[in-house]
Amino acid sequence: MPESVTFTNMCMVCDGDRVLVQDRLDPAWPGITFPGGHVEEGESFTDAVIREVWEETGLRISAPRLVGVKDWYSDHSRYVVLFYRADRFSGTLHSSEEGEVRWEALADLPKLPLAPDMGDMLRVFLEEDLSEFYYRIEDGNWIQELK
């Protein structure tokens, strides 16, 4: 059976020592995270992250940099989250149906109610020697690996 792949993105928008966070309302994955979403059919990865940040925050980012990935495989399907960072933006900040957006000090993020696994994802965003957060199944259990 061929493998299907779903591509999504997440962007850490930086403004000095502050980062833009989103307090997600989705009960399937609630908590503090970064804006992002699905790559649409025929859309480039870069265009997708620019569009998603704009839709969810009102900010137009430019020159986002790919800094890592999160991925997992289950039942002939792979899910890939592309991690971007951006420090150039324009526009007026506003929240969306995805959740409230606001600026927080980067140093304060570990104290906030982060979405599940967001602490490990944050390491991939920040640590230059990490580029992948991978889930695999071993003996019926999900194992997390930071690479």
Model-flagged regions — what are they?
Residues 12, 21, 83-85, 103:
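Conserved hydrophobic/aromatic beta-strand scaffold that supports enzyme active sites
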Residues 18-54, 140-147:
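Conserved Nudix-box catalytic region and its N-terminal flanking loop in Nudix hydrolases
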Residues 14-19, 27-28, 40, 73-74, ...:
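Short, charged/polar surface micro-motifs in flexible loops or helix N-caps
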Residues 1-19, 35:
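Conserved N-terminal beta-strand and adjoining loop/helix that marks the start
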Residues 72-92, 121-125, 129:
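Active-site-adjacent beta-strand/loop module that shapes the phosphate/pyrophosphate-binding cleft
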